Regions:
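Divalent metal-coordination and catalytic microenvironments
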Residues: 32-35, 65, 102, 155, ...
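Small-residue-enriched transmembrane helix starts and helix-helix packing motifs
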Residues: 2-31, 54-60, 129-153, 174-183
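Membrane helix-loop-helix hairpins that form the core translocation module of multi-pass transporters
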Residues: 53-129
Length: 279
């Protein structure tokens, strides 16, 4: 969520434009390595005995996650008149997100390098490791509960609070609710598609599905590193920060387009019978 602070400086003045930006940023949040790792694990766990739940794991996970985001956003918006975010919150939250994105990208690329060409790559996330037992969730409520647990982190809460403070200051409570809803909807779309995608891959056992996971691992790691690099540059250079703020909507759209292309490429690779080495 490194790009989210750019929302505050976005040149878009129309509420609809801000809602679109918030929705696209929600899609970006949905491709965090922790989200993908958790959804992957729960989908695989339920694929055999509960295939219907497996296909909807991403949907229920993101709904639980989104409830926390909505609660934080509305709570901050309702108290915005009596509380002002400290100056250190935005840079601290940004650097926390930058560090987490860079670390997770490095871990996932290392896993990609270690994995044999014909084997599936398992995405890594610190929360997925911390809540490893919870990832065996075998009911809709349990999956939503995991989404709630994953939302209880400084980067998620701080960015939600920042979005609320920004929206409340410039557009009011109704606008805050719209922005938060658009953000959560974008996240639901990506996480829901990810759960469906993993379920489809499980139905296609063999080298093709394994190669597809390698495609996604490289794509997600690249997005994480690129986002971290841009966020760090924006924090260190006012010129870069201004450019990124001016083009924040297009940057977010580009990220989502890359994710969509990698999903489609993964499905195409999974269908190909001939071996394709990506390492």
């Amino acid at each position: 969520m490194v790009i989210l602070p750019m929302l505050a400086a976005s040149p878009l003045s129309e509420l609809l434009g801000l809602a679109i930006v918030a929705g696209v940023l929600g899609m970006r949040h949905g491709v965090d390595a922790d989200h993908l790792a958790a959804i992957d694990a729960m989908t695989r766990c339920n694929a055999g005995a509960r295939p219907a739940l497996a296909r909807r794991t991403g949907l229920w996970f993101s709904l639980g996650h989104g409830l926390v985001v909505l609660a934080v956003v509305l709570a901050v918006a309702l108290t915005a008149h009596a509380w002002t975010a400290p100056d250190w919150l935005q840079p601290f939250g940004a650097w926390t997100s930058i560090a987490m994105l860079a670390l997770l990208a490095a871990l996932n690329l290392a896993a990609w390098r270690r994995t044999a060409p014909g084997a599936a790559v398992e995405l890594t996330g610190w929360r997925s490791r911390l809540f490893n037992g919870a990832l065996r969730a075998c009911s809709r409520r349990a999956v939503m509960g995991v989404g709630v647990l994953f939302a209880v982190s400084f980067d998620t809460v701080s960015q939600a609070a920042l979005m609320a403070a920004t929206g409340a200051a410039s557009h009011g409570l109704a606008a805050v609710a719209l922005l938060a809803g658009a953000f959560v909807l974008g996240m639901i779309v990506i996480d829901g598609l990810n759960g469906w995608w993993v379920a489809r891959l499980i139905q296609r056992p063999g080298a093709g599905a394994a190669r597809a996971t390698r495609v996604m691992c490289v794509a997600i790691s690249g997005i994480s590193l690129g986002t971290a690099a841009l966020g760090a540059a924006a924090q260190l250079s006012p010129t870069v920060a201004g450019w990124a703020a001016k083009h924040s909507a297009w940057l977010a759209v580009a990220i989502v387009a890359i994710v969509a292309a990698s999903f489609l490429a993964g499905l195409a690779v999974a269908r190909r019978p001939s071996p394709l080495r990506l390492a």
